[in-house]
């Protein structure tokens, strides 16, 4: 007897504008319920305090979420100088207060020091896991556990505003960068302490900012569909981006129809014009149907690694 599905089969990526005050997993579950999707996964957690772009993959798109986890991010952040908190943001308790004696040039010089590659020790108040539990669970119990420094890259950090004890910046960084840690380190560098009061993710990979939708907008569309006696799918599905947008940074290899079946059965194939190495995005035929991602093997062939399964 076939297993009964717990949701509908729907594939794509929705760019959720996560509200403040809820976890990324809570936001994911709300979107999954609204779409009635069988499978869903997000592509990199945001702090409950943070808002902004949270790409959520539905269906077969979940197979490619790691590529978005590994992609560059952009954040807009407001920091308050003069107060250091135990979480490095305004959700925590103030643990130190110091006077602010910072001028514009000193601030610019300190900010510039964060550009480039560096080692960053993740905050105890992060979603990274230690022995199967998020670090923040240990932190809330007053337990500190060992964390290894991780290589991060800050490609750009720009000062947008400096008024009184408030600093507003935009940061373009690699995966795994903790903006709260940057702000805390900046505060110590300035000698006055600092913590995050607003954090908004404004970019993931090359996804367009204007395609984000809020939970309120999604709920309103569902309610309107019910009033109009329309299928929810008819109003929500057009908001989805194609699943291959998760891997559009990879070079494309287009295979002829005769090779599509071989690829879909997991066989490596020779494709003229393919790169000499690395990961590739595989499409098939003149319509460039997205088949999945592959890797150039030692024989120069395109070897499929993660494939899309279409249909029921």
UniProtKB/Swiss-Prot annotation:
InterPro entries: PsdUridine_synth_cat_dom_sf, PsdUridine_synth_N, PUA-like_sf, PUA_sf, tRNA_psdUridine_synth_TruB, tRNA_sdUridine_synth_fam1_C, TruB_C. Keywords: Isomerase, tRNA processing. One of its GO terms (molecular function) is tRNA pseudouridine(55) synthase activity. It is an enzyme of class 5 (isomerase). Belongs to the pseudouridine synthase TruB family. Type 1 subfamily. The gene is truB. Pfam families: TruB-C_2 (PF09157), TruB_C_2 (PF16198), TruB_N (PF01509). Signal peptide: none annotated. The active site is at 47 (nucleophile). The keyword Isomerase applies. This is tRNA pseudouridine synthase B. Its EC number is 5.4.99.25.
């Amino acid at each position: 007897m076939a297993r009964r599905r717990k949701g509908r089969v729907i594939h794509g990526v929705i760019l959720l504008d996560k509200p403040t005050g809820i976890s990324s997993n809570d936001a994911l579950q709300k979107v999954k319920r609204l779409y009635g999707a069988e499978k869903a996964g997000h592509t990199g957690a945001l702090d409950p305090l943070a808002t902004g772009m949270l790409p959520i993959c539905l269906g077969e798109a979940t197979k490619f979420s790691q590529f978005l986890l590994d992609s560059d991010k952009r954040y807009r952040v407001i920091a308050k100088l003069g107060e250091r908190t135990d979480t490095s943001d305004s959700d925590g308790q103030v643990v130190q207060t110091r006077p602010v004696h910072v001028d514009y040039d000193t601030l610019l010089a300190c900010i510039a020091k964060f550009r480039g590659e560096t080692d960053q020790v993740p905050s105890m108040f992060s979603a990274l896991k230690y022995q199967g539990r998020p670090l923040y669970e240990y932190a809330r119990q007053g337990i500190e556990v060992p964390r290894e420094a991780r290589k991060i890259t800050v490609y750009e950090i720009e000062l947008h505003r400096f008024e009184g004890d408030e600093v507003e910046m935009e940061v373009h960084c690699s995966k795994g960068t903790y903006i709260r840690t940057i702000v805390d380190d900046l505060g110590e560098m300035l000698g006055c302490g600092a913590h995050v009061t607003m954090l908004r993710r404004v970019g993931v990979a090359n996804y367009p900012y204007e395609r984000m939708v809020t939970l309120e907008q999604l709920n309103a569309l569902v309610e309107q569909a019910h009033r109009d006696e329309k299928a929810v799918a008819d109003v929500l599905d057009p908001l989805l981006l194609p699943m291959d947008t998760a891997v559009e940074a990879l070079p494309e290899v287009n295979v002829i129809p005769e090779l599509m079946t071989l690829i879909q059965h997991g066989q490596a194939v020779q494709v003229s014009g393919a790169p000499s190495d690395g990961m590739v995005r595989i499409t098939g035929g003149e319509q460039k149907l997205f088949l999945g991602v592959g890797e150039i093997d030692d024989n120069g062939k395109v070897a499929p690694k993660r494939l899309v399964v279409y249909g029921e």
